[in-house]
Amino acid sequence: MDAIRRIDYSELVDVPKLQALMESFSEVLGLPNAVMNIDGKIIASAGWQSACTNFHRVNPETCARCLQSDTSLAESMTRGARYAIYRCLNGLIDAAAPIMVEGQHVANVFAGQFLTEAPDLEFFRKQARQFGFDETDYVAAISKIPVMP
């Protein structure tokens, strides 16, 4: 019996053109986005929030939360969900949908980080203190996250 060859999405697409598409998408909609393979490797991304790039993804504890949240969304896709919306463990919202090729789940497209209501600044101030972030800078970064009711 022949093993089914796992499709590598990054071999199927022109990655620089995909990157340009993701940048345009982010600019038009005002939302960060990414395409990740099923192993969680980022193929293309644009518009990430400074709360994530300057705080969450650089602190070991909050970065672990990011990875756990990404994994939870990706697992929803492997269980056959058409899409998933998830509040990450750092308090932000991400959405994802699977990319299928010839019936095989090969990657996920993510939109986010965003909020569905004005940020709970006390929650984020507490989080800043908990993880040693500069509270003023962190709250300023959180305040820039798009709200999509």
PLM features: residue spans?
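Juxtadomain coupling helices with adjacent low-complexity linkers
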Residues: 1-29, 107-149
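Structured interaction and signal-relay segments at domain junctions
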Residues: 2-91
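Sensory/regulatory domains in signal-transduction proteins
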Residues: 68-129, 147-148
